[in-house]
């Protein structure tokens, strides 16, 4: 039966809930992930009085969570993408700052070495000039080794960060599982899920998404979270653990695994998005290519300088040796191999060396070779034995006996080159600035024939420094050191004992031209000039890219990638800001609206209190009337 007091009391209770909820909204205006709550009122069932229905007041049917699943998912996705791009751009900037140092960078060190070569060319007999060349060579080597060390440190830093991020993801997953349990129990007891716990759970999912991309599936009052290629991170009240393990393909690299009740699952290839995805992308797209390219540049410098230096002569009269040395080709056995084969590799042609690693895999009948970066198959010759090595992309690969089907080996052509880069000579007198041979025409020659200075074709020829005489037996024929007669072609190549000369003009019968060792020619700078010219010649990419161009390209590529990453990050930040604003426009707390609601509920509450007061007055009047 309706009564004024009951109606007023129901109103007071409902409005008290509304005021409490509004105050709760205001209190959480700055709480990340908080969704605004709104009290839903329902009219109480009316009572029949006579022939009329009289109302009985109001009930609170629900404290509703103002939530849009689409907007939440959209903002979560853009936040995760922003975290990925920010992690990539931040690491890219570190790499760019290192390689782009114009004062102490690789280009500056290379220029210092080139300038020292020019000084030796100007004063080839100067010991101080040669000493400066060695010093600049060491400075260049130290810069390359330092860069390689810094890149390795960056890789180690990333691995350390991976371990920390994996632990945080595990803790967040455990928090979600715990909240799943609490929400389920609360919903079963009251019929409604607790809004604040739902917000907390969504907040944890947002935080995980900021670290790694995940997908969610609702199951009752719980949310299941999946990572990678669909591996379960959270199932109901059970959370799996993410950990870091050593990559079986590379002991220097860390990858991710999921520890579940049924065992360990490799999820590395499926990890994307968030901070972890950004770091993985940066390692794959920038860090590892930069390390390989730095090694390739080291190979180019050593190959070009050494080849020319071996064709020169030092102050002691000896042929030049290697000026620089580099690290060898690295080979890594995959940890899952079951065979006993030992694989080794050497470089045969620096011009054909690429900046990628390779995977050599044993099949039932032989081997396959593919690029590790793209997975593309590589054409090769040979079977892999010592007498018939596998030849591909400037490499010679020998696989020993004992490989089992499925065994894999990772070939690193350039990665270890930089760490072993150093100057191979210490004595300045051993700098081979001079050409090893000199050619001259006899002063008694009657003709007007001239001879070139000569060039070395094969510095390993045992007869290279043996004196040879070219004697013209007629105007059209000559012999070399008493050998058979040969037809004279003006300007034609004469190749003997590993050297080459050209004779021009019109030699007369009996004219003699002599090629001999250049020992003692301290003023000869021909090989020093050739050493400097060689650094500008093509040596990489099939002989089309010079050392200087390779250094400039590495710096430019890293700079371009960095700027692109920063632009992408800034653009995504705008998208994320819009997505968050769209979410907040629905779920966020608007203080103006809450203040208006508070005032409205306050006035209604006061009116309800007045209803109760009037009801009390009427009741008192009735009692007084009865007493009379």
Q: How does the language model describe each region?
A:
Residues 1-628:
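S/T-rich, low-complexity, solvent-exposed segments of bacterial secretion/appendage proteins
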């Amino acid at each position: 039966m309706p009564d004024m007091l009951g109606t007023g009391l129901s109103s007071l209770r409902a409005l008290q809930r509304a005021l409490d909820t509004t105050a709760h909204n205001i209190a959480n205006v700055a709480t990340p992930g908080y969704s605004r709550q709104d009290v839903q009122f329902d009219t109480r069932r009316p009572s029949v009085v006579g022939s009329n229905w009289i109302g009985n007041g109001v009930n609170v049917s629900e404290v509703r969570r103002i939530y849009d699943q689409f907007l939440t998912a959209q903002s979560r996705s853009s936040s995760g993408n922003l975290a990925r791009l920010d992690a990539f751009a931040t690491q890219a900037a570190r790499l760019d700052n290192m390689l782009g140092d114009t004062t102490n960078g690789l280009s500056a060190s290379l220029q210092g070495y080139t300038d020292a070569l020019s000084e030796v060319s100007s004063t080839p007999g100067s010991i101080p000039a040669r000493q400066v060349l060695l010093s600049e060579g060491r400075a260049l080597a130290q810069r390359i080794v330092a860069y390689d060390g810094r890149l390795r440190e960056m890789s180690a830093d990333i691995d350390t960060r991976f371990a920390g991020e994996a632990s945080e993801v595990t803790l967040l997953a455990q928090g979600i599982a715990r909240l799943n349990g609490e929400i389920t129990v609360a919903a079963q007891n009251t019929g409604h899920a607790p809004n604040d716990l739902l917000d907390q759970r969504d907040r944890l999912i947002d935080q995980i998404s900021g670290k790694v991309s995940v997908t969610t599936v609702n199951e009752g009052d719980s949310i299941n979270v999946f990572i990678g290629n669909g591996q379960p991170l959270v199932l109901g009240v059970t959370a799996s653990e993410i950990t870091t393990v050593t990559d079986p393909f590379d002991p220097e690299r860390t990858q991710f695994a999921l520890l579940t009740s049924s065992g360990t699952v490799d999820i590395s290839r499926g990890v994307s998005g968030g901070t972890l995805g950004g770091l993985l992308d940066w390692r794959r797209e920038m860090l590892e290519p930069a390390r390989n390219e730095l090694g390739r540049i080291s190979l180019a410098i050593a190959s070009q300088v050494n080849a020319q230096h071996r064709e020169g002569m030092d102050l002691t009269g000896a042929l030049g040796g290697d000026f620089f040395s580099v690290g060898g080709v690295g080979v890594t056995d995959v940890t899952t191999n079951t065979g006993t084969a030992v694989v080794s590799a050497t470089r045969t042609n620096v011009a054909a060396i690429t900046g990628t690693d390779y995977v050599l895999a044993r099949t039932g009948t032989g081997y396959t070779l593919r690029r590790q970066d793209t997975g593309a198959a590589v054409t090769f010759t040979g079977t892999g034995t010592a007498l018939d090595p596998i030849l591909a992309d400037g490499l010679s690969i020998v696989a020993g006996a004992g490989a089992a089907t499925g065994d894999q080996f990772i070939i690193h052509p350039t990665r270890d080159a930089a760490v072993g880069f150093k100057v191979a000579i210490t004595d300045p007198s051993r700098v081979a600035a001079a050409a090893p041979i000199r050619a001259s025409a006899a002063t008694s020659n009657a003709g007007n024939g001239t001879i070139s200075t000569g060039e070395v074709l094969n510095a390993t020829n045992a007869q290279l420094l043996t004196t040879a005489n070219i004697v013209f037996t007629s105007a059209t024929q000559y012999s070399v050191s008493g050998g058979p007669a040969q037809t004279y072609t003006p300007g034609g190549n004469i190749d003997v004992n590993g050297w080459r000369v050209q004779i021009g003009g019109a030699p007369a019968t009996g004219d003699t031209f002599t090629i001999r060792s250049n020992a003692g020619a301290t003023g000869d700078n021909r090989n020093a000039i050739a050493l400097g010219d060689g650094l500008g010649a093509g040596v990489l990419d099939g002989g089309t890219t010079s050392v200087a161009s390779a250094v400039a390209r590495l710096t430019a590529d890293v700079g371009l990638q960095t700027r692109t990453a920063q632009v992408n990050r800034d653009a995504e930040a705008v998208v994320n800001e819009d997505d968050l604003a769209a979410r907040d426009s629905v779920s966020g707390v608007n203080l103006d609206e809450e203040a208006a609601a508070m005032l409205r509920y306050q006035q209604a509450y006061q009116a309800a209190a007045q209803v109760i007061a009037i009801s009390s007055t009427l009741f008192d009047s009735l009692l007084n009337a009865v007493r009379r």
